[in-house]
Amino acid sequence: MTFDKGLVARIADALLQLRENGIRQKNVFGGRGFMDGKSAFVIAWGSGIIVKTAREEYESLMKEPGVSPFAPDGERPMSTWLVVEADAIADDPELTEWIQRGLRGVRR
């Protein structure tokens, strides 16, 4: 899977606006991952993102438009990971909200 370099830049800009320091980038699942310590919390993947969510938010977030479970093998979803389609993060505030959800997912 490739990733959208413009989306990577948008994620990096959002993290600057959130004053999140120490976040690094790494290739993950064929996309470009953003890491808090050793944990990926959001991955630019295709034209959308993959997000690590807090366990208690997973079921409700899965009901949002443009969101589906992440199943890297095509069969079994990884618990607490969601795919968010490009349309669901078209605006910067929406993208920022998903980034914050990802950060909560790895910091709990």
Please give the residue ranges for each predicted region.
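Charge-dense, helix-prone N-terminal extensions
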Residues: 1-108
